[in-house]
Amino acid sequence: STAGDTHLGGEDF
């Protein structure tokens, strides 16, 4: 994931 991961599971969305 990227430095902007703030979603569930820490995935990129």
Curated annotation (Swiss-Prot):
Provenance organism: Rattus norvegicus (Rat)
Molecular function terms, GO-annotated: ATP binding
Role, per record: Chaperone.
Family recorded in the similarity comment: Belongs to the heat shock protein 70 family.
Gene Ontology terms: cellular component: nuclear matrix
Coiled coil region boundaries: none
Name of the protein in question: Heat shock cognate 71 kDa protein 2
Source organism superkingdom: Eukaryota
Localization per record: Nucleus matrix
Entry keyword set: ATP-binding, Chaperone, Nucleotide-binding, Nucleus, Stress response
